[in-house]
Each structure stands twice: as C-alpha cells, then as structure tokens.
C-alpha cells in the first residue's frame, strides 16, 4: 500500500508558558498543505526501513516510521513489513514532515493489517512519537494546545481557493535555540479569534513568536518573508520554529527564488 504524507504550516504560534516537564505550552493553528512525501508498506520476511530522496539524518533504527511500527507491534500481532519512504518534504524545516511520516505509517498499518483503530486510538499511539504527530491523523485545520498535541476547533479555517508559496532556505534552526529566544507570555489575543477575521487582518495580528529572535540571528529568513509581501502575499510568516517561510496568495504567485541543492520551494493551490 502507498500513501502520501503531507506537510503542515503553523498559522500563528504563541508561546504561553514553560511547563514543569521542560516543554512549553503553546497555541497555534496547524494547517495541512500539499507538499508530500511518498510512503509504501509491503509484507516482507523481516522488518526493514529504506529511504530515497532527501537525506534523512540518523540511522534506520531511529526513524519515526519504524518507531511507529514498533509501538503498534507492542499492542498488536503485526507481521514483518518493508517500509520505504521517498522524502521530499524538507527536514527540520518547521513543516512537520517527520511527524507526518509517522502518523501516515500508523494509518497505513491500520489499513494493511485491518486493525480497525479509530482516529482517537491512532492519535494516542503516535502522540509519544512527536508533539504534532497526532495532528496528521485527522489532517484538517485545527487549533493545537499544550505541547501542540491536544486539539480543538477542527476545521477552524478554510483557505480553499488560495495559493501557497513555501521556501526552505537551507538554514537549520534548532528547536531549543528557537525556544531559548522567546519570553513566554499569556497575555495574548487568542489565535482562534484572529483566524475568524478576514485574511487581510492577519498581517497585523497573527504572529509567530519565534520570528523575532530567529530573524535577528538569521536575517536571510526575514528577507524571505519581506519578499513574499513584495510579491503580493496576503499573509506571510515563518512556519513553526523555522526555517521555512510561506506566503498565502489570492492568485498563483510568480517564482522569485530558484531551487538549489540547499534551497527547496513549493507553489501549490490550497
């Protein structure tokens, strides 16, 4: 069986408070976007993970797809499989590609082995794999709370008919580095309230808290956001802790940045 794990963007991201477990409480909106990997799972004599496309750091044994298989196998009698991932979504880019691969592995295994797991059951299985993994089970726009792994208001925003332009500039921003540059603050306008307003209002009100410190350290990322607005974006931002920048357009935008070995981009209808 084959599936196509998609990326996501963050529409706004508020860092609210530091948690006793060392993580942070956040509020954000996850929105699925059509930048996809390809995932195939077939029966095999022994369980193995292989990949192609973008290079995936680490060993096969540490891959999130294989980790998800192992978690499921602890609860259900799964036979061996060959998991192959063709990686197109940039890695460490604020697009949730690894989390999506894990979630789609769970969904595909659910189909392959006819486990008949509900969405809620699959969310519980993948939640330990990564904070935003559970989002990709239902895979619809939604508000995320706490560590980004509990949800409310599914379908909160619909950008159908718009276009998205994403550029990953080949800059790695470590998640810890991004959080270290943010001062948590609970005195915020709820992101859900902002998203209910017209798209034209978002530029003034919908903020990603990571941008200020990340832009100071990596001005090239800030420049990309400015270029999106110069191209006519109705809204532009950095996704998650970076470094991908996206613009939302009313019509198909013109390309202003060439792809290289380090820089990847995607233009697609939403």
UniProtKB/Swiss-Prot annotation:
Q: Which domain of life is it from?
A: Bacteria
Molecular functions per Gene Ontology:
4-(cytidine 5'-diphospho)-2-C-methyl-D-erythritol kinase activity; ATP binding
Pathway per the UniProt entry: Isoprenoid biosynthesis; isopentenyl diphosphate biosynthesis via DXP pathway; isopentenyl diphosphate from 1-deoxy-D-xylulose 5-phosphate: step 3/6
Q: Which residues are ATP-binding?
A: 90-100
Q: Name one GO biological process term.
A: terpenoid biosynthetic process
- Alphabetized UniProt keyword annotations: ATP-binding, Isoprene biosynthesis, Kinase, Nucleotide-binding, Transferase
> Nucleotide-binding among the record's keywords?
yes
Any idea of its EC number?
A: 2.7.1.148
State what this protein does. Answer: Catalyzes the phosphorylation of the position 2 hydroxy group of 4-diphosphocytidyl-2C-methyl-D-erythritol.
Indicate whether Hydrolase appears among the record's keywords.
no
The protein's annotated catalytic reaction(s) are:
4-CDP-2-C-methyl-D-erythritol + ATP = 4-CDP-2-C-methyl-D-erythritol 2-phosphate + ADP + H(+)
- Signal sequence span is none
Q: Which family does it belong to?
A: Belongs to the GHMP kinase family. IspE subfamily.
Question: Mind telling me which NCBIfam families this protein's record contains?
Answer: ispE (TIGR00154)
Active site (UniProt): 8, 132
Q: What is this protein called?
A: 4-diphosphocytidyl-2-C-methyl-D-erythritol kinase
